[in-house]
Regions:
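Anion-binding alpha/beta catalytic cores of soluble intermediary-metabolism enzymes, centered on
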Residues: 1-220, 225-329
Length: 329
């Protein structure tokens, strides 16, 4: 029986950022998958010259051999890309590229999507607020009213978020019993179905300092978080919490946790990036497609330099391949 080969689609991200540099690096990294990149051919070749590397544009899908060839789907840019310098209309072309990529994955032309960093501020200027790939792709998939969520992953260290790109002042009112319950269920289901963890152990942080200290520093733990945890434990889920966030990410809990669930963006991502920067992978849970991405931004100041670290990008591709294989089991 012929082994199924994962088909991965990459969107190269902000043209002036390091996305193109990372794609050049990919040309010399072998993967057991067919990999296609949505990008501008001219800009990619220019970036390769800047890096003093030769790449070959491939016209037919093939196993990614890592011998300098890249399968490209050309995306037109309005102006010449100047490394490190934002050009609004080139940046906005990324929205169309994301649209094309997501639809291609929905139509099962590709097994998984890997996205490289974009400039959120520029993309928001298109008329609709762009708060991030997670929310934008969720709308494209028609899952915006479901608990789609961000999970960051580095081997067996995983952190998921209840809320993502909202102001800290808006976090408490955004955490309702229903939202928290659905978020925990989404996390649990994805860990079972996509990561193949039979009974996930999930450690949940509190919202307030000391997890509220019995109501002294806030009541969300007593009113919302604890009742939801108890309800779901009664339904058979393996949950621990609410744990004070300042001690949650310590060796004791790391050893007994398949995934942490943090209440807001920096509460979960600050410790994760401190421990896993350049090795972390973002993935979006609750979507009908597989989507992964790097754990860093556009890094305009590093474009064309030798300081670029491609580890997170390569790990994003590797996880996309793994999740594809798991989904087919």
């Amino acid at each position: 029986m012929k082994k199924a080969i994962a088909k991965i689609l990459i969107v190269s991200g902000e043209p002036a950022g390091i996305g193109l540099d990372l794609c050049v690096e990919l040309a010399y990294k072998k993967f057991d998958a067919e990999i296609s990149i949505l990008t501008n051919c001219i800009a990619l070749l220019d970036r390769a010259r800047l890096q003093k590397k030769k790449i070959k544009i491939l016209t037919k899908p093939t196993l990614h051999a890592g011998k300098g060839g890249l399968q490209i789907i050309d995306v037109p840019y309005e102006k010449k890309v100047i490394p490190g310098k934002i050009e609004k209309f080139n940046s906005l072309a990324q929205l169309s590229a994301i649209d094309i990529a997501v639809n291609a994955c929905i139509e099962k032309k590709y097994d998984a999507l890997v996205t490289l960093p974009v400039n959120k501020k520029i993309l928001s200027s298109s008329g609709g607020k762009f708060t991030g790939h997670t929310e934008y792709i969720s709308r494209l998939c028609g899952t915006q009213n479901k608990e789609v969520m961000l999970l960051v992953n580095n081997n067996n260290f995983r952190v998921a978020l209840v809320t993502t790109h909202i102001a800290l002042a808006d976090v408490p009112k955004s955490i309702t019993k229903n939202k928290l319950e659905q978020t925990i269920k989404t996390l649990n289901n994805d860990l079972i179905n996509n990561f193949k963890i039979k009974r996930p152990k999930i450690t949940i942080t509190g919202l307030n300092p000391h997890a509220g200290e019995g109501g002294e520093f806030g009541t969300e733990e007593k009113r919302i978080i604890m009742p939801v945890i108890n309800k779901l434990i009664g339904e058979g889920l393996y949950l621990t919490g609410p744990i004070p966030a300042d001690t949650a990410f310590t060796e004791k809990y790391m050893k007994q946790t398949d995934s942490f669930l943090a209440m807001y963006h920096d509460q979960g991502l600050a410790p994760f990036k401190a421990l896993s920067f350049n090795h972390g992978v973002n993935t979006t849970l609750g979507l009908p497609i597989i989507r992964t991405s790097v754990d860093h931004g556009t890094a305009l100041n590093l474009v064309g330099s030798k300081k670029i670290n491609a580890n997170s990008f390569f790990e994003s591709i590797a996880l996309a391949i793994t999740l594809t294989k798991n989904k087919k089991i």
